[in-house]
Amino acid sequence: MKNGGGNRVAVVGTGFVGSSYAFALMNQGIADEIVLIDANENKAKGDAMDLNHGKVFAPNPTNIWYGDYHDCRDADLVVICAGANQKPGETRLDLVDKNIAIFRSIVESVMASGFQGLFLVATNPVDILTYATWKFSGLPYERVIGSGTILDTARFRFLLGEYFDIAPTNVHAYIIGEHGDTELPVWSQADIGGVPIRKLIESKGEQAREELERIFVNVRDAAYQIIEKKGATYYGIAMGLARVTRAILHNENAILTVSAYLDGLYGERDVYIGVPAVINRHGIREVIELELDDNEQKWFQHSAATLKGVLARSFAQ
């Protein structure tokens, strides 16, 4: 991180997610400087112009411009949103081969600038590409973060809030594991106002359990539904990225479900995967190890094994 002065965020990739993220940063007044970098220079120029025209309405002054990888040298945070998009019918893991080569070029270019900050990865499959960013950058793993299951957890809390007619900010529940088809809900640790969700429904019988299972399925499959309807997801993840950015730049020590490196916790090693972690200006201060029940532990192991299988194929030497 820079000593003194304002903070700088470099956004690599100004497609739907990158431009929505920059918009969220400006609207919330999170960053002092935002530099937009894209292979399509005109797109980055256009986004910078468009965002600058709204500065008069922003809560805080923000310096926004289009730039190149040299601008990453003084960045506190580089957020990678570039890569091939998920198409209808594709899983996130289908994008691996398309995006690893792209990431090698991006990360090597960022590091060549003299960058000494943190990486935040948004591109799918995010757990795999966060691992790739760590490998290609040579940075300590706590300084490389993926968006993980932050959006899945937000979707989960939103739908549970609707079901129980409670503000989603008062629903405490996590989705962990792969940001994708093998993710899992941690029902054993889910509560509203300190009351376990399982206890809230125990008098309602099998129907309530089935309704909660449908809520999880809708969380897991939300991206497929949105992509089928509008071609891409970007607003929700942009706000999730802004939340992680705020935790970093404001040194919040906030607990967020990000893609973090495991080195023994949850019984797993050498994998980036979605888990609750404490986030501050140094990156991941620590990973929170939830107490999972037996079924959740087996499910999590399956999710980690799925990611490790992809990593083994992608990084075989």
Curated annotation (Swiss-Prot):
EC number: 1.1.1.27
Catalysed transformations (reactions): (S)-lactate + NAD(+) = pyruvate + NADH + H(+)
Active site: 179
Major enzyme class: oxidoreductase
Positions annotated to bind substrate: 86, 92, 124-127, 152-155, 233
NAD listed as a keyword: yes
Regulation of its function: Allosterically activated by fructose 1,6-bisphosphate (FBP).
A GO MF label: L-lactate dehydrogenase activity
Involved pathway(s): Fermentation; pyruvate fermentation to lactate; (S)-lactate from pyruvate: step 1/1
Residues the record lists as binding beta-D-fructose 1,6-bisphosphate: 157, 172
Signal peptide interval: none
PANTHER family documented for this protein: L-2-HYDROXYCARBOXYLATE DEHYDROGENASE (NAD(P)(+)), L-LACTATE DEHYDROGENASE
Family to which the UniProt record says this protein belongs: Belongs to the LDH/MDH superfamily. LDH family.
Identification of the protein by name: L-lactate dehydrogenase
The organism of origin for this protein: Geobacillus thermodenitrificans (strain NG80-2)
Taxonomic lineage of the native organism: Bacteria, Bacillati, Bacillota, Bacilli, Bacillales
